[in-house]
A protein has these predicted regions:
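Amphipathic repeat-derived elements
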Residues: 1-13, 28-32, 140, 151-166
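Core catalytic region of metal-dependent phosphoesterases/phosphodiesterases
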Residues: 2-95
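Conserved beta-sheet core of the metallophosphoesterase superfamily
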Residues: 88, 99-101, 106-166
Length: 166
């Protein structure tokens, strides 16, 4: 399976459309969204192209291909609009004998990794892309942000296929 991994949409439909175009062109099987889907949040500027209703419509059309977790800007009212679950702090993805912990990053991240039998933590929240390992050999993947990248980065996301990240 080929997974598209991203986070921090923050209600920006043009950013989501670019990612969904990639999803289709690269023939990804599933997408994992690490939170902050509809709301731009009180600390961010209002994104150009904000369209919460458009975000909901586009993602609901792909609901059977989405695994998502709750970000710090996601609310219970958002769940009422979405046809896929988003309210959990984390989810486990098992593929090719490896276990991946999917989370937003505001609770669990590389500085606060929960104990558990997983091979890699995948998160967003900081809007800073990262691909590394900790001292225990667990993978650390921060998908950055497709809407508000920080650190001079361009919008970022990742793919996972056969245990390899790109």
């Amino acid at each position: 399976m080929k997974y598209l991994l991203f986070s921090d949409i923050h209600g920006c439909l043009p950013a989501l459309e670019k990612v969904l175009d990639f999803f289709e062109q690269e023939k990804c099987d599933m997408m994992c969204i690490m939170g902050d889907i509809i709301n731009y949040g009180p600390r961010n500027r209002i994104p150009e192209g904000i369209d919460p209703k458009g975000i909901v419509e586009r993602l609901n059309a792909l609901a059977d291909k989405i695994v998502a977790v709750r970000g710090n800007c996601d609310a219970e009212v958002d769940q009422m609009l979405l046809d896929f679950p988003i309210m959990e702090t984390y989810a486990l993805l098992v593929d090719n004998g490896k276990c991946y912990l999917l989370t937003h990053g505001h609770v669990y991240n590389k500085e606060n990794m929960p104990k558990g039998p997983y091979d890699c933590i995948i998160y967003g929240h900081s809007h800073l892309w990262e691909l590394s390992h900790n001292e225990e050999g667990q993978g650390i993947v921060n998908t950055g942000s497709i809407t508000f990248p920080k650190g001079g980065n361009v919008p970022t996301f990742a793919t996972l296929e056969n245990g390899k990240f790109t």
